[in-house]
Structure formats: structure tokens, C-alpha cells
Amino acid sequence: MSETEREDERWTPPIGPIDPEHPECAAVIAEVWTLLDGECTPETRDKLKQHLEECPTCLRHYGIEERVKRLIAAKCSGEKAPDSLRERLRIQISRTTIIRG
């Protein structure tokens, strides 16, 4: 097992503001999927990217989510989730992040 794989096994997703210098981490993590899916506004995209450039923990979380997205795309290509399901999932992810934060 490589060092990166061992680090991934030990890593747990950030919950809430984890860095006093970056109190917006919980909101960024809640919106990572909108950035990955290209579903955020240009203004939100710029804010998220700026935060990711400044916050190594959120950048790491983003990288893991990006890998998950690629894996799902490779295994489930061709089918798109209905809009209603995507919206319910987005709301649930936001609620989970807010509750934990």
C-alpha cells in the first residue's frame, strides 16, 4: 500500500470550521460537488477556488471528492440521475454538513 493510500485511510472528512483562519470550510465542503459538477455560478466558483488555493485541508477533501466522482463516472457512465434525486441529495448533504458543523 502506498503512502498516499495509507493517508487516505487515516483521513476523515473535515466537519465544521476546522481551521480558525478559514471559518468558511464547512460551507466550502458543502459546495464542493457543485464545483465538481460545474453547477455553481461563476462568482461561487471563483470563491470556492480561491478558498481551495488557501486551505490545504479543503483542497485535500476536494481531491478525494474528485476521485470519487471519476470512479462513479467510470462505473456508472451513461445514466444520469433525475433532477429531483440530485436536488434531494444536495439538500441532504447540506443538512448533514450544517448539523455536524
Curated annotation (Swiss-Prot):
Keywords: Iron, Iron-sulfur, Metal-binding, Phosphoprotein, Transcription, Transcription regulation
GO molecular function, one term: iron-sulfur cluster binding
PTM notes: Phosphorylated, probably by PknB. Phosphorylation decreases interaction with SigH, probably leading to increased SigH-mediated transcription.
Outcome reported for the amino acid change (mutating residue 25 to A): Slightly decreased inhibition of SigH
Region (Disordered): 1-20
Residue positions where Phosphothreonine is found in the record: 96
InterPro entries, sorted: Anit_sigma_mycothiol_RsrA, Znf_put
Keyword Transcription regulation carried by entry: yes
Pfam family, one: zf-HC2
Record-listed iron-sulfur cluster binding positions: 25, 51, 55, 58
Cofactor: iron-sulfur cluster
Cofactor annotation comment: Binds 1 iron-sulfur cluster per subunit.
Similarity field: Belongs to the zinc-associated anti-sigma factor (ZAS) superfamily.
Role description: A redox-regulated anti-sigma factor for cognate extracytoplasmic function (ECF) sigma factor SigH. ECF sigma factors are held in an inactive form by an anti-sigma factor. Overexpression leads to increased susceptibility to diamide.
Subunit: Interacts with cognate ECF RNA polymerase sigma factor SigH under reducing conditions; the complex is disrupted under oxiding conditions or as temperatures rise. Binding inhibits the interaction of SigH with the RNA polymerase catalytic core.
Name of this protein: Anti-sigma factor RshA
